[in-house]
């Protein structure tokens, strides 16, 4: 999951070096390779090695909390994490397993760096296919430099490319995913939302459909956080969350409108030079619109400011669509089920059995993809 809208201060992750002496039983590299369907390529080998490193750092949260050397900030975060984790299973119907009941201090701000790419004249993301996850709209690396190396290669092939750090990910229940130190860079409510999101992936994951999977998990994240705040009687935080959701909807509306303009442009028979110029105009206009929205809302979106500074492109809009395009459809489905989560999950499972095109016709704007 990528936290799309806000970025915490750099180097704000609390450290818990004292707990590193505790270890849970290690999966072997062979087990990680089996999960990935083999480690016959350097890419899969780095993925397996990175996963083993994360799992090697796991410490039971109860152990961390009992350790008198645990920094106060880590202790406070993990106390709240433990409560949110119980709420996730007891009240949201999310998997009751060992995931997010341990902590891993990974010593860096992100656990992986995702590469998203789209053709020069398309907002459909390039897809990469893997044995377990199926085909997804990104390629992740446990170290930053290889992600940028791939980005340079793709750019040389004519793709628009984006590289983003990711604070959390899910192994879809294959391993007991820990709470990562990279996740503690965010506020406690964002941390709870991240756990709800990642557990939703464990509850339901459809091969070869990133948009469906991410929108489902984002919907569970939103609903779960609202119910978690209501459970705590956190009226002020609830209002802040709703205000943030409204700001997010306005921002996503700008991004999806720009995406629609580009889709129309790319479908036109314009000469290449003219299309390049008009593409640049769309992104210039979007930059102006984002900054006007920031002024009107009285907020700043650091992540999007970074995007503007680096140059907006098709890959940026493709990544936003992956997380948000189908969310309104999932929210409608939830309301149709009387806002009852078990009924909602059952309805989503039925949709998951349909062909991808039919799922998207019911929930999302159908879209094509570039394959490679």
Regions found by a protein language model. Give the residues of each.
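Pan-zinc metallopeptidase signature
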Residues: 252-372
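Bacterial N-terminal signal peptides
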Residues: 27-38
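Amphipathic alpha-helical packing elements
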Residues: 48-88
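Acidic/His-rich structured neighborhood in mature extracellular/periplasmic domains
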Residues: 84-248
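Bacterial signal peptide processing site
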Residues: 40-43
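Bacterial N-terminal signal peptides that target proteins for export
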Residues: 7-29
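Solvent-exposed, acidic/flexible segments
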Residues: 54, 67, 74-81, 140-147, ...
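Acidic/histidine-rich, surface-exposed loop or edge segments in extracytoplasmic proteins
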Residues: 55-70, 128-136, 310-311, 328
